[in-house]
Amino acid sequence: MSLPMLQVALDNQTMASAYETTRLIAEEVDIIEVGTILCVGEGVRAVRDLKALYPHKIVLADAKIADAGKILSRMCFEANADWVTVICCADINTAKGALDVAKEFNGDVQIELTGYWTWEQAQQWRDAGIQQVVYHRSRDAQAAGVAWGEADITAIKRLSDMGFKVTVTGGLALEDLPLFKGIPIHVFIAGRSIRDAASPVEAARQFKRSIAELWG
């Protein structure tokens, strides 16, 4: 089982704020996510600028595309994104359109499982050639005190068994990682737990050490 990668989510409102994070920890992570908040705040230039600064890193545009899949994904890929996200409630043709464009750029598409989705949809995504999904505990659910539970673990295992590369996100803390041991997680996303740590560098390194210990 390969080691899960570590992704930092830049849900900053400005590039200036995002740079405060990346200048510290960009070399400690595998993937740099231009979060939805930053995409809205700064547009695709955020993707272009971060990829220019860190060409050796995977840069994800978390656009959460809901419609106009070909148009919006092309905007992201032309800004040199490596991956883009499509929201799970989008029509299957939106996901297919985004994937068609991704292939032109040797990129990839992730289905963001935020909110309601079904296993029937999951099979449609697989049948369409989608390889990646993001299992997401929402920011608002976290704020309401919703913790990771057995239902989450069961769903993540099932997605993995279907052949998806599963990314896990949603207020992940270091102490949450053992919950997922034994599952071939593709990526763990840490946002505030790294960005807001007293030492973001040490926080990122602790995540990497824990991943190596649990999956190595």
Swiss-Prot record:
GO MF annotation terms: 3-dehydro-L-gulonate-6-phosphate decarboxylase activity; magnesium ion binding; orotidine-5'-phosphate decarboxylase activity
Annotated site (Transition state stabilizer): 64, 67
Metabolic or biological pathway, per its Swiss-Prot or TrEMBL entry: Cofactor degradation; L-ascorbate degradation; D-xylulose 5-phosphate from L-ascorbate: step 2/4
UniProt catalytic activity: 3-dehydro-L-gulonate 6-phosphate + H(+) = L-xylulose 5-phosphate + CO2
Induction record: Induced by L-ascorbate. Repressed by UlaR.
Cofactor detail note: Binds 1 Mg(2+) ion per subunit.
Named cofactor requirement(s): Mg(2+)
Binding annotation for substrate: 11, 192
Keywords (A to Z) from UniProt: Carbohydrate metabolism, Decarboxylase, Lyase, Magnesium, Metal-binding
Any matching Pfam family: OMPdecase
SMART domains with a match to the protein in the record: OMPdecase
Top EC class for this record: lyase
An individual GO BP term: 'de novo' pyrimidine nucleobase biosynthetic process
Cross-referenced Gene3D superfamilies: Aldolase class I
Record-listed Mg(2+) binding positions: 33, 62
EC number: 4.1.1.85
Quaternary structure, from the entry: Homodimer.
Biological role: Catalyzes the decarboxylation of 3-keto-L-gulonate-6-P into L-xylulose-5-P. Is involved in the anaerobic L-ascorbate utilization.
Family: Belongs to the HPS/KGPDC family. KGPDC subfamily.
PANTHER family with a match to the protein in the record: 3-KETO-L-GULONATE-6-PHOSPHATE DECARBOXYLASE SGBH-RELATED
UniProt-recorded name of the protein: 3-keto-L-gulonate-6-phosphate decarboxylase UlaD
Source species: Escherichia fergusonii (strain ATCC 35469 / DSM 13698 / CCUG 18766 / IAM 14443 / JCM 21226 / LMG 7866 / NBRC 102419 / NCTC 12128 / CDC 0568-73)
Name of the encoding gene: ulaD
